[in-house]
Amino acid sequence: MKKYWHIALMLFCVFMITSCGDDDEALEVDEVWKVQNEEAFQAQMLVPGFEQLSSQSNAGFILYKVLKTGESKEPIYYTSKVECYYKGTFIDGTVFDDKSFEAGAPAELTVSEMVDGFATALQNMHPGDRWEIWIPQQMGYGSAGRSASGSVIIKPY
């Protein structure tokens, strides 16, 4: 009888593990939002002062504008850990992430753990630089809308 109890417990555990699996709910793709973002990125390409910077992953390019050049010429590598201030906004100005100077302490980031567009910018900056960057969806959170940890960060498209 004791043997059957263990078998029943093992089967229960198997079902529990299976039921705790990842519930990837299908996130609805917003085609209108996608088109609006692509149009805003294209329009930003025409704004004086912005330049294109290709990613090393060949996923595309970001747009950047140098607001301030820092004193240091020390390079930032893909494996670097950096402290930086930033503010992530949607094209309508809504803030989705704020680690700006006004918000308090800088974020401590590992470049390799950032979305491709952010990593591309950081690897071309130097300590003390201040840039405005525009990241296209394929180099940001893309159609998943998720961060590396899997949490939904932005509206996917």
Tell what function each PLM region has:
Residues 4-5, 20-157:
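Cross-family detector of peptidyl-prolyl cis-trans isomerase
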Residues 15-19:
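C-terminal motif of bacterial Sec signal peptides marking the signal peptidase cleavage site
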Residues 5-13:
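Sec-dependent signal peptide hydrophobic core
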